[in-house]
Amino acid sequence: MVRWKRRKAAFLLSIILLGGCGGNDLADQPWVAYHQQLANDLSVGNIEQAEPENIGAFPERKARLIEVPETRDSILNVYALRECQITSLVAARNNQLGRVAPPSQQWLYERKLWQRLNSCWNSNIPEQLSDENRDRLEHLTATKTAQLPAVSWNAIFDSSEWEQSFSRASQPLTQADLMDVPQHLEAIDYLQQMTEHQFDPEWQQDSSTLESHLKTLQERPLTAEVLRMLLLANQRLREANNLLRQQSDEPSHCLRQWDAASLERLAEAANQWLMAINRLIDTQPVEKPSAVQRYQTRWLSLHNPQAPWAQFQQAKSQHESLRAHFDTC
């Protein structure tokens, strides 16, 4: 019985391991075929391929969040501001379900609270309050106004959907995956709108729309897939470049056309995605945690020469230049 269980466990583990390799093999197939084409054209052996590096670990939760002090006040003090229509909102936030609400719902609560406080402060209600309650309203409104950008940042960076997008347990993006990218871009665009309009009293957020977009982001770790696609392409291009460089002194062979259309489509999707991610991060009116700044510069940047995008562009440009030394078959 014990032996059977061990065999079953080993069998299941083998399935998991094989399953984990499948996506990478799929992304690598066009490169294997292209390397073989180059080797045949140049009458050499197979190009030796190495495993590309994985992306770096996403910053730990504590390192990527901004501390927001909890606002505490008595029920009586909140009730004194009942004309601002915040009592039921605060009560819902303080009940058991409200305290364990996901970051997205906390974001909606804080923004709605700010809207009501801001509207109240800019109405004739403060004139009807006692001096003490008017000061209390002014202080609470100022506090929530100052905290809202950090709350918005935390709502995104504390969400499991956002963290999942950067998962190292992922595979490179493939041609077949491109159909999912537009829907993910729509999700990022909605988060962008929420961020840009967080201080717009007229703009109304929608809970179901927000949750729907977050669900989309959770369906696949697209940021990680994009980065790993770039790392794979960079690795394979540099391997091909090494071969072409060795043969370029006496280019006695011709090269067949390189069908790079699928790579161009993947690169365009990667550029669109990284632009959207960087724009969302940079739009936040906060001082970004240093761990997030480092991760963004190292992995997400479109300008850092050491980041995956620039490395891929450099390798691709070198490859096109090296191919130009050879006649086309």
Feature names for model-found ranges:
Residues 2-11:
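Bacterial N-terminal signal peptides that target proteins for export
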Residues 17-20:
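C-terminal motif of bacterial Sec signal peptides marking the signal peptidase cleavage site
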Residues 139-285:
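Extended amphipathic alpha-helical interaction segments
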